[in-house]
């Protein structure tokens, strides 16, 4: 059977709304062994996708940092994306991830995964050599020119990509039609970036969504969620309450959910340090998810499979807190 799934026209920013969940790449028990060659649990992958769609998520992102884009083989990536596309069957939009170390490899992977059926790619810049602004801008222009049918989500993580994604960058990205959205960290410069990039749907982190939506209710209509991998009910509840608050002016419930999320995340970051967290991002996120019990993330692929035990304890505590929130808000959604 062909892996190809018929797609509609390229996504636009207007298609990006609601709760966008970022998936891990579930692993087999032997995934931490470098000798292993087929480490993706495809059955669990399909189950997670079905459960996310049943829960009501608006879109799915994959193969970012804790999605282990950096440590999957090309065969594993193709099998994983094929499974997701075949499971989704066009019911929600899906961005794969094709970040790599050079433009030609990014284009090759993007072409193949879009051909399989992904709607777009979540894409960071190559990071072996630190990029300046003109190089980063040209990189995205080249990918857009090479794969014009692919929607692009800018993966704006300064820690991962050694690039600050400065204000002029966003102004240039807004000129590329394929760039429709961005996985966005922090909201200190959000108001300015919204003005510089009027054609891009910025996705703040779920912890920041309430505050971001208050900054600009019309433009901020979607967010990215990793906590949903501990159970999606909290993210769905936040989405719905922000929509309601925009209509009624009563933001109290949305703020309460946001506060719950922040509290659950409080032990995830070692010493409250995002830079330290970023060294162990994959292991900490997968430990959080496994502790929550909603999915089976499985062991990390090498070389990123070593994490300090005390850091893991904080991640596991966070996962259990998110599991409690999922139970709480599942009852409220009934």
Curated annotation (Swiss-Prot):
UniProt cross-references to InterPro entries, sorted A to Z: Aldolase_TIM, DapA-like, HBPHA/CBPHA
Key word Lyase present: yes
Enzyme Commission designation: 4.1.2.45
Keyword Ubl conjugation: no
Catalytic function, reaction form: (3E)-4-(2-hydroxyphenyl)-2-oxobut-3-enoate + H2O = salicylaldehyde + pyruvate
GO molecular function: 4-hydroxy-tetrahydrodipicolinate synthase activity; trans-o-hydroxybenzylidenepyruvate hydratase-aldolase activity
Residues spanning the membrane: none
SMART domains: DHDPS
Note: Encoded on an unnamed 75 kb plasmid.
UniProt record similarity statement: Belongs to the DapA family.
Function, as annotated: Involved in the naphthalene upper catabolic pathway. Catalyzes the transformation of trans-O-hydroxybenzylidenepyruvate (THBPA) to salicylaldehyde and pyruvate. The reaction is reversible.
Name this polypeptide is given: Trans-O-hydroxybenzylidenepyruvate hydratase-aldolase
Gene assigned in the entry: doxI
């Amino acid at each position: 059977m062909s892996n190809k799934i018929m797609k509609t026209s390229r996504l636009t920013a207007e298609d990006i709304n609601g709760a966008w969940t970022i998936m891990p790449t579930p692993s087999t028990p032997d995934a931490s062994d470098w000798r292993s060659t087929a480490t993706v649990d495809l059955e669990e992958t399909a189950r997670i996708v079905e459960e996310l769609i049943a829960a009501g998520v608006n879109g799915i992102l994959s193969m970012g940092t804790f999605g282990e884009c950096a440590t999957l083989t090309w065969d594993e990536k193709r099998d994983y994306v094929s499974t997701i596309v075949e499971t989704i069957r066009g019911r929600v939009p899906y961005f794969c991830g094709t970040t790599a170390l050079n433009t030609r490899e990014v284009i090759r992977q993007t072409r193949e995964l879009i051909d399989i059926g992904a709607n777009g790619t979540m894409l960071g810049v190559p990071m072996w050599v630190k990029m300046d602004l003109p190089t980063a801008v040209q990189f995205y222009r080249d990918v857009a020119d090479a794969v014009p049918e692919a929607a692009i989500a800018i993966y704006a993580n300064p820690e991962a990509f050694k690039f600050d994604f400065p204000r002029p960058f966003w102004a240039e990205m807004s000129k590329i039609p394929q760039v429709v959205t961005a996985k966005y960290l922090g909201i200190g410069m959000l108001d300015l970036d919204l003005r510089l990039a009027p054609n891009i749907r910025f996705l703040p982190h779920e912890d920041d969504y309430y505050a971001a939506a208050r900054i600009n209710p019309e433009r901020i209509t979607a967010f990215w969620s990793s906590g949903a991998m501990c159970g999606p009910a909290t993210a769905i509840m936040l989405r719905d309450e922000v929509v309601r608050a925009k209509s009624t002016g009563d933001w109290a419930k949305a703020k309460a959910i946001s506060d719950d999320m922040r509290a659950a995340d409080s032990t995830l970051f070692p010493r409250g340090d995002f830079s330290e967290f970023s060294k162990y991002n994959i292991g900490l996120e997968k430990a959080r998810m496994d502790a929550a019990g909603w999915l089976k993330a499985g062991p990390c692929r090498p070389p990123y499979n070593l994490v300090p035990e005390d850091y893991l304890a904080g991640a596991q505590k966070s996962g259990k807190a998110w599991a409690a929130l999922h139970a709480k808000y599942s009852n409220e959604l009934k």
